[in-house]
Structure formats: C-alpha cells, structure tokens
Design a protein with these regions (language model features):
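Short, small-residue-biased leader/transition segments that mark boundaries at the very start
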Residues: 3-8
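C-terminal beta-rich recognition modules with glycine/proline-rich loops and embedded aromatic residues
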Residues: 11, 19-20, 26, 30-130
Length: 130
C-alpha cells in the first residue's frame, strides 16, 4: 500500500481543507506522547502540593479499581518513573501508565476512560512530595 505525506499550509477560516477525498485516503496523526508530571495553575488552591500525569495532550487519572490497596496513600515525586502499557480489555484498548514511587506503585488510565468498569474513587490530582 502506497503512503503519501502531505504538508498543509493553506487554511480556510482556521481549518485545513483537503477537497478531493478518495475512499483509500487516510490521515495519520503522528506526535510525541511523552509522560510528564504537570502542576495546576497556582491560583487553584485545592491543587496546591499536587500534580497530575499527562501523556501528550491526554490527562490521566487513577481509579480505585486499579489501586485498591494504596489509593489514598499514593504520591508522586521527582524520582517517580513511568512505564506505558497497552491494555486491550478497556474501551477496545488504551495505554495505561504505571508508576514506581518510593512506597508503592500505581496505575493510571486516560481520563476519558474512567468509570467504565466498577464504581469507586477516582483522582486526577495526586499529592506531590518534593
């Protein structure tokens, strides 16, 4: 199968327009998806001392179903490491993030995928220990 790459420079009202579509045309979006620890705006007092995990443009969350034993004790730190893994049995497949923290490890899923298995706690903003 032949693949072509297109660079779209012309835009109509802010949108890229490709007028001549064929049934075999495919648009592939390829972007870096690094895992990062991000902070909230400092004006959000409720998130002081907490951080979230983001992979590319996706925000991740922690669900109790994946972290039942240590859900309320999990913390992030500058030394936290991350591993991504594909899990096929949630919403036809998602990338999870596993952390290895000082005291315990945790599993995070994309925010869009939460509340699709079992009722329980969910958290985006995780205590951060510098």
């Amino acid at each position: 199968r032949r693949q072509r790459q297109m660079c779209i420079r012309d835009r109509e009202k802010g949108y890229a327009v490709i007028k001549d579509w064929k049934s075999q045309d495919v648009i592939a979006l390829d972007m870096d998806m690094p895992v990062e620890i991000v902070a909230a705006d400092p004006h959000v007092k409720e998130n002081f001392g907490k951080r979230a995990i983001q992979r590319g443009p996706l925000v991740y969350c922690m669900e109790e179903i994946d972290n039942p034993e240590y859900f309320d004790q999990i913390q992030l730190s500058p030394s936290t490491t991350f591993q991504t893994a594909f899990v096929s049995d949630i919403l036809n497949g998602i990338k999870t993030i596993k952390t290895n923290g000082r005291a315990q490890s945790a599993t995070f899923i994309p925010y869009y995928a939460w509340d699709n298995r079992k009722a329980g706690k969910m958290r985006v903003w995780i205590p951060y220990n510098e």
